[in-house]
Amino acid sequence: GLRGSLPKEYQGRIVIKVSKAKTDELVNSCKEQAALELQYGEPWIVFDRDRVVRFDEIISQARQEGVHVGWSNPCIEIWFDAYFGKMHSYQDSVACCREFRATFEKKTGQEYQKANRQIYDLLNRYGDESGAIQIAENRFQQFRRDGFCKPSEMCPCTTVQHLVDEIKKKTSG
């Protein structure tokens, strides 16, 4: 996964921890982890809109409390889609997942499984991460130029590229 793609000297210094928490508890859970382990100097949460009612409020709370946010609206597959050169205009998670599954299988020759621990490796092998970052950032900035401020109104869109870009900057030294 992402950790394995980091240069060896950074694999022990950048901590990537996946935690199960209810969406409403993500910020507090992240802050608790950061307080327990001092190496979490720059805490992030990553989550999808899906059917999260308090999507905007959770993002706002995180920012106010010093937690960075990588969000996807409607789902993480919109970010994955960008690896293959496009960010389609899906408005709901079901359509987004269904269409990404078809694209993924066409591009990789493999079945898409949401919980696949190798997804990052596969996206990088068959797709273009730098292109994905640019596509996602262009979409995000276009929504902002168009006057959209709330992440829930920015669909399809993601800010996961900010996390990936930050990791790349920290490890390309």
Write out the residue ranges for each language-model feature.
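Short, charge-patterned binding micro-sites
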Residues: 20-26
